[in-house]
């Protein structure tokens, strides 16, 4: 299960997070404090940005009903020591999970889980490709719903559902986003009303999750999981020399024949804000117009966004 907040009425979280914190984390903290997340066994929090680092401690002291397992991912991924370090981080997480569940992860189970997740990645990548060929059916809201649903299903069950959707799409005649997420649905409705279709995305909440498989060999389960992190690319939360994300987006635009790029800038998201000038510069040099929109799941007024999207759509 993935925690991406929601339209929470921020009250209790104000005691733990400042108003300029990421709205997703504000909502997650509020839901943890007000009991919405009660029933969860444990929460794993990766310390990938300043707000997430604060969340590890805020959750530990504020949400006592739900244990928290922190994990710090290495950013100097070229160093051999980074692999060993990440394995040790995973081992600590497993100890916390064993304390909560009463069972230690078995190597055989971990290997099988990796296979299940890799199969799910492949199904989701195929869906993203097929969706671009059926934009009359897979509207922005439908596409988002399919992608987001993966966070709330057992992966094996969700894989089967996606495979069935893919098979149905294949029977039909064939007639890009970047950022963290593109919610709530009002934003997707605005895009659809302005005849903007999504042919690809680079959202953390969506396709970025399925871009990199865990290696099928190369050691035990934990080592292979660590190698998967080392193999990730094109994400603002991962350090990469030379800022290659722009060229990656250009290649995506060319492959999917995109007309432009909408940058979904999560409010108060420092890692995304650091990346934005670089990839927008590269995209504009390549001839792709860019529109940067602020994503705030707590917002309820979208008139200004509607005007900006209308103006952007008139470019094409």
Give each language-model segment a name.
Residues 1-109, 204-205, 209-316:
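Trp/Phe/Arg-rich N-terminal binding region typifying the photolyase-homology
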Residues 91, 95-213, 238:
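A charged, amphipathic alpha-helical module
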């Amino acid at each position: 299960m993935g925690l991406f907040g929601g339209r929470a009425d921020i009250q209790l979280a104000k005691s733990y997070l400042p108003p300029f914190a990421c709205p997703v984390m504000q909502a997650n903290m509020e839901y943890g404090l007000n009991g919405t997340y009660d029933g969860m066994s444990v929460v794993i929090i990766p310390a990938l940005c300043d707000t997430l680092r604060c969340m590890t401690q805020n959750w530990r002291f504020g949400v006592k009903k739900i244990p928290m397992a922190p994990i710090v991912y290495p950013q100097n991924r070229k160093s051999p020591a980074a692999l060993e370090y990440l394995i040790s981080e995973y081992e600590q997480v497993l100890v916390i999970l064993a304390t909560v569940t009463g069972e230690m992860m078995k190597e055989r189970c971990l290997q099988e889980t990796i296979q299940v997740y890799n199969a799910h990645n492949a199904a989701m990548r195929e869906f993203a490709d097929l969706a671009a060929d059926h934009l009359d059916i897979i509207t922005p809201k439908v596409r988002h719903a399919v992608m987001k649903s993966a966070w709330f299903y057992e992966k094996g069950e969700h894989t089967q559902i996606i495979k069935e959707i893919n098979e149905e799409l294949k029977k039909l005649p064939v007639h890009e986003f970047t950022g963290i997420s593109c919610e709530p649905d009002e934003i997707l409705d605005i895009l659809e009303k302005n005849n903007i279709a999504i042919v690809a995305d680079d959202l953390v909440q969506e396709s970025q999750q399925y871009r990199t498989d865990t290696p099928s060999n190369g050691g035990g389960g934990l080592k292979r999981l660590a190698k998967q992190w080392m193999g990730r690319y094109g994400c603002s939360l991962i350090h990469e020399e030379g800022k290659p994300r722009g060229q990656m987006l250009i290649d995506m635009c060319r492959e999917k024949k995109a007309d432009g790029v909408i940058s979904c800038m999560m409010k108060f998201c420092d890692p995304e804000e650091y990346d934005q000038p670089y990839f927008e510069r590269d995209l504009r040099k390549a001839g792709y117009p860019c529109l940067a929109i602020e994503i705030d799941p707590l917002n309820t007024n979208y008139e200004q966004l509607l005007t900006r999207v209308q103006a952007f759509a008139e470019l094409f």
